[in-house]
Structures are given as C-alpha cells and as structure tokens.
UniProtKB/Swiss-Prot annotation:
Keyword annotations from UniProtKB, A to Z: Late protein, Membrane, Transmembrane, Transmembrane helix, Viral penetration into host cytoplasm, Virion, Virus entry into host cell
Subcellular location: Virion membrane
Main location: virion
GO cellular component: membrane; virion membrane
Keyword Hydrolase among UniProt keywords: no
GO biological process terms on file: symbiont entry into host cell
Family: Belongs to the chordopoxvirinae I2 family.
Function: Late protein which probably plays a role in virus entry into the host cell.
Transmembrane annotation, as ranges: 40-60
Induction record: Expressed in the late phase of the viral replicative cycle.
Protein name stated in the entry: Protein I2 homolog
Key word Nucleotide-binding present: no
Pfam families recorded: Pox_EPC_I2-L1 (PF12575)
Amino acid sequence: MEKLFTGTYGVFLESNDSDFEDFINTIMTVLTGKKESKQLSWLTIFIIFVVCIVVFTFLYLKLMC
C-alpha cells in the first residue's frame, strides 16, 4: 500500500491537493471493494419493518386465542 501511495504521489506533486485526495480515495475504494449503496440500506430497513409487523401480528393473534 505504501508503494502505491509513493508512486502516485510523484504524479500529483504539481497538482491541487484536492485532486490528489480524490485520486487516493478512488484508489482506496477500488482496493477495498467497498461500494456505497443507499438502495441496500433502504431494503434492509424495509425488511426489518416487515419482520416487525409479522412478529407483532403473530403476538397479537396469539394473545387473542
């Protein structure tokens, strides 16, 4: 990882710091394989909500009998 930073730093010596930071963030994202996905988080919230409704409905019906 240090070799990557050292090699790419020489290319960006004369450019803006923000360009270098954006490039490093892009490289880190590619290397770690992390993807930002807001759709997945909404899907997770929806599934948890549905599971809660099912559990509460089951408990309500169980108490009624």
